[in-house]
């Protein structure tokens, strides 16, 4: 004697098993894609801040205080990122070492903080960058 519920339960069980397997796999692949993107994004941000410091007339260096927003532009070549960064003046001179850990100046004067929009192309396989746009206020 066969049980009709058992015949229906087996396909449903298989479906649940397949769906749960899909849910487990999907976040891992998305996480890998995001990790690959961030591997190229961080050096691109550093390039933008270094370019800002080189072109600035200020004797003090600025470093990033906050990434306000960022996105990858929809172009195939090169990889292009746009980012809105908040830069703040440090107590270190421009060409000192370890600017990435240099403390910020304490005063919050008008010239101590900039909000900048950078658009930068990156060629990660040859470690080359190109600044397409830089607007600061």
Swiss-Prot record:
Where is it predominantly found?
Answer: secreted
- A Pfam family name for this chain? Cystatin
Keyword terms: Antimicrobial, Disulfide bond, Glycoprotein, Protease inhibitor, Secreted, Signal, Thiol protease inhibitor
Cysteine disulfide partners in this protein: 92-102, 116-136
Which cellular component, as a GO term, is one annotated location?
A: extracellular region
Q: Name one GO molecular function term.
A: cysteine-type endopeptidase inhibitor activity
The residues that the database entry marks as glycosylated are 36, 111
Which Gene Ontology BP terms does the record give?
Answer: antimicrobial humoral response
Top-rank taxon? Eukaryota
Q: Describe the disruption phenotype.
A: No visible phenotype; probably due to redundancy with other family members.
Localization recorded for this chain is: Secreted
UniProt keyword Secreted present: yes
Signal peptide location in the record?
Answer: 1-31
Tissue-specific expression: Expression is restricted to fetal gonads and adult testis.
UniProt xrefs under InterPro entries? CST9-like (IPR043250), Cystatin_dom (IPR000010), Cystatin_sf (IPR046350)
Q: Which family does the similarity line name?
A: Belongs to the cystatin family.
Described function:
May be involved in testis development. May play a role in hematopoietic differentiation or inflammation. Has immunomodulatory and antimicrobial functions against Francisella tularensis, a Gram-negative bacteria.
For this entry, the protein name equals Cystatin-9
Gene name in the database record: Cst9
């Amino acid at each position: 004697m066969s049980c009709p519920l058992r015949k229906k339960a087996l396909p449903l069980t298989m479906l649940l098993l397949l769906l749960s397997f899909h849910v487990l796999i999907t976040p891992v692949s998305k996480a890998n894609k995001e990790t690959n993107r961030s591997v190229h994004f961080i050096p691109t941000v550093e390039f933008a801040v270094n370019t800002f410091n080189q072109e600035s007339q200020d004797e003090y260096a600025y470093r990033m205080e906050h990434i306000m927003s960022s996105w990858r532009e929809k172009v195939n070549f090169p990889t292009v990122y746009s980012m809105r960064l908040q830069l703040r003046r440090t107590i270190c001179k421009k060409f000192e070492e370890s600017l990435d850990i240099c403390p910020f100046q304490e005063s919050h004067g008008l010239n101590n903080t900039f909000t900048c929009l950078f658009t930068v192309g990156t060629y990660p396989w040859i470690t080359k960058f190109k600044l397409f746009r830089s607007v600061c206020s």
